[in-house]
Amino acid sequence: MSLLPAVKVLPLGYLGIVLVFSLILRSAMVDFIQDAGKLERIDTYKREAQMIFGAPMWALGHLMGRK
């Protein structure tokens, strides 16, 4: 004697898993979009520093923050 037949429960479980998975992906996607904006600013700074200081790429970390 079951309360709900398995035919009605299985699609609800599948729908629940899909919804939870989509929420997890959406939250991760927002983090990656924000991080991409930060990386773009860092790359811009490296290009500007290379033009200003004329330093090779390996030396930019040493020159960052100095004026």
From Swiss-Prot:
Signal listed as a keyword: yes
GO biological process: defense response; neuropeptide signaling pathway; positive regulation of muscle contraction
Secretion signal span: 1-30
Keywords of this entry: Amidation, Amphibian defense peptide, Cleavage on pair of basic residues, Pyrrolidone carboxylic acid, Secreted, Signal
GO cellular component, one term: extracellular region
InterPro entries reported for this sequence: Bombesin (IPR000874)
Residue list for modification Methionine amide: M64
Tissue expr: Expressed by the skin dorsal glands.
Annotated positions of the Pyrrolidone carboxylic acid modification: Q50
Protein localization: Secreted
Propeptide: 31-49
Homology family: Belongs to the bombesin/neuromedin-B/ranatensin family.
Protein's job: Stimulates smooth muscle contraction in isolated rat stomach strip.
Protein name: Bombesin
Organism: Sanguirana varians
